[in-house]
Each structure stands twice: as structure tokens, then as C-alpha cells.
């Protein structure tokens, strides 16, 4: 029986999976068990394919049935899992490629590189973003194609109510090749663009992760060897700054998912390799500790330790660390992981950070394993398995 993972919800309390003989199943993480099943609508033996986006642990989910038929792939259903009833249905002009949402906003991404932004409370359309833009539409490179290869627009939405939307966009500086390597930061509630990060990678961006509060954003390109973390907005000069550069490895590997933990101190990534990498981030806060000056006198040692990923930066450095790290990155090697998890190379895995449990990461795989690991805090090393369950 084939399994296909759909992923965790926003706070890693549930995850969803497709099984060939059942359809979509949502599992609760603690206590572990099934909490919802969406049975397949056909008795045929075709391979099932769905998009499912959960809204935390609520009874609301967004579903796109992409199994068979072009018309189904254009249709979004909002389903109440308790009543097992469709409460809203929307049809779009092109195939739906992704759906993301939080408690305020739902965003639908089409194969035509359009993003539809809705108020989730009433499903009112707030904005349609045409990522390709009028200039690119007029060029011969895009006239007769719906998307560029298999690289489409990538999106990520902050899970809090600020609703910061980050999405990839075609390069404004390289109009000849037009790679998807610019990033636009968009306030989805106010429907205004608040920042643009040009050419964050040389090639197409294949994965974006927005931090829960929308203050940070991680990006990875097709090569997947380097992960970059940016501030979405610099509070002093309104320009984005590079917070960290992480080296995942030397061999190319397409990264399928990245996640920040809920206090923005860790970033995890998973892809085609046999390792889930966890990187340490500097603490960012506007509150300075009383002993900030004393801490800053020892900043050389603290910064060196943090750069090597061996400990987290103290809160006393938080206000000044953003400026320090930018000057340090160009002259130092890219940072490696502080923790890792080995996984079977032939099984796809998804990752999630629980909000209420610190120093813990959840993973689930298409081999039918749901695993909880403890992350080492004071030294580089493997994560420790603390809980395991199986699902089908």
C-alpha cells in the first residue's frame, strides 16, 4: 500500500497522509491516533493525489483533489471535518499548485503563477497577485507556456495573525533568463507589498519558509547546498539583511521543506538526501538584558561560539547581533548544522516543530513512521529518538 505525505499543520499537533486504499487521513500527534478520514471518491486503482492544508487543530481544512480530471485540479473545497461537509467551494481558471492559510488568510497558488488572497472568515477575495507580471507576459519566453519547467512560484505565510506572505518572483535584473530568484514580502492583511529581496540565489528558488512571526525568511535554490536566512524587514533602514548562510552539504539535493521553530532559534530542512539538518539561529528580540554591556565585552567569544553552532547567542546580544552577523558572514565559512537526524534515503519525510514543547522536532515519513526527537542543545550531534508510532 503506497503512502504519500502531505505534512504537519502549523503547530505540529496533527499531520495528514494519503493512502492508496483509504484516501486522506489526518492523525493527531499527542495522543497519537486518527482524527479524520476523507475517503476517496472513486473505486478505480489510480494513484491518489491531494492538496490538504489544515488550520491548526480546528475542524477546518482546505482540500484539492488532483487525482484525475483537469476540472478537479482547479477546484478548492473548504471542509468541516467534524460534520464531514463541504462549507465552501471555489473554482479557479488554472490548476491549483499550493494552498496555505492561517487564522486570518488563505492563499491559493495557481500554475499560471497567480496568487489569490482571501479573508478566511468570509472567503472574500482581497487581492489577486500576478507574479509573472505584464512585462514578462509580453515576452516570447512566456507567451505560450503556463509555467517555466517544473519550477513554479513558491510561497510561505506566517502562522501568526500578522499574515506576512513571502513569495518568489521573476528576476527584475535578469530579464533574459528570468529565474524565479527574487523574493517579495507582502502584508496579506493590508494587501500591500512591504519589501523586495532581489536575486537571493543565482538560480530558481524551490523552497521558502517564513518564520511564525513573519520576521525571518529562509530560502533554498535548485542546487540546495546553501540555505540563506533573511530578515523580512530591517527596522532601522528598511532594507533586508542577511542573518545567516548555512551549508547543508556539498552534494546537490532539492530541499522539499524548511521550518522555523516557534521562537526563531532553530531552522530545520529536509529534502532528497538521507539527513534532516537542524541549524541554530541568533536570538532576535527588542528587549535588552540588564547585563548587556557586560555581555558585549565578551561578544568575540560568544559570537564565535554561535557562528560555529555550538551554543545559542545570549539575549544580551540580541539588539546588536543583527549588525554584527552581517559583517562577520562574508569573512567566515558558511555554518553547518548543530543537530541532525538520519532517515532512509528512499522515503520522503516531513518536519514540524511543536509550539508547546521546546527542543523537540516531529518527523513523519512515507515509510509509515511518526517519530519525535529531542534536539541536543550544547553540542553538535544527532537528535535522540524519544517517541515512535506507525501509521498506514
UniProtKB/Swiss-Prot annotation:
Cell compartment(s), UniProt: Cytoplasm; Membrane; Vacuole membrane
Entries under SUPFAM superfamilies matching the protein: WD40 repeat-like (SSF50978)
Top-level taxon of the source organism: Eukaryota
WD repeat start and end residues: 200-240, 250-289
Key words of the record: Autophagy, Cytoplasm, Membrane, Protein transport, Repeat, Transport, Vacuole, WD repeat
GO biological process: autophagy; protein transport
Membrane topology category: Peripheral membrane protein
Annotated motif L/FRRG motif, positions: 246-250
Disulfide bonds: none
GO cellular component: vacuolar membrane
Predominant location: cytoplasm
Role played: Required for cytoplasm to vacuole transport (Cvt) vesicles formation and mitophagy. Involved in binding of phosphatidylethanolamine to ATG8 and in recruitment of ATG8 and ATG5 to the pre-autophagosomal structure. Protects ATG8 from ARG4-mediated cleavage.
Family label: Belongs to the WD repeat PROPPIN family.
Entry protein name: Autophagy-related protein 21
